[in-house]
Amino acid sequence: MVYVQYLLQIIAALGIFNVWLLRFGQDTEYRGGKASNMSEEFLVYGLPIVAVYIIGFLKIMSAIGLLAGIFLQWFVIPSAILLAALMIGAFGMHLKIKDPFKKSIPALIMLALCVAILLLAA
C-alpha cells in the first residue's frame, strides 16, 4: 500500500505544480467566475492580491512536502493536512461566488487525494 500512497503524493504534487507554476497566467475552464488567470481569480473571490502569493507559496510548499515525504515520511501528514485545508478553502471560494459545480471539481479531487494520502499514511 505504501506505493499507492507514494503515487497519490506524486499525482497531488504534480497537479499543484501544473496549476501554480505552468498554468498560473493561463485561462482555464475551472477558473473562478470569468477570471482568465490566477490573479484575476483571487480578485473575483474578493481576496487581496497578496493572497495569491501567500496561498501559492503554501500550496507549492505542500507539494514539495508531499514529494519529500517519499523519502522523509514525517513530511507527509503536515503537507497533506495543509493542502486539504487549502482545498476546502478553494471549494468554499467557488461556493461563495456561486460558480457552477464543474469549476469546483479540481479542488474536490485534490481534497480527495489528500484524504486518501492521510488515511494511507496514518
Features from the language model and the residues they span:
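Membrane-interface extramembranous regions
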Residues: M1-A122
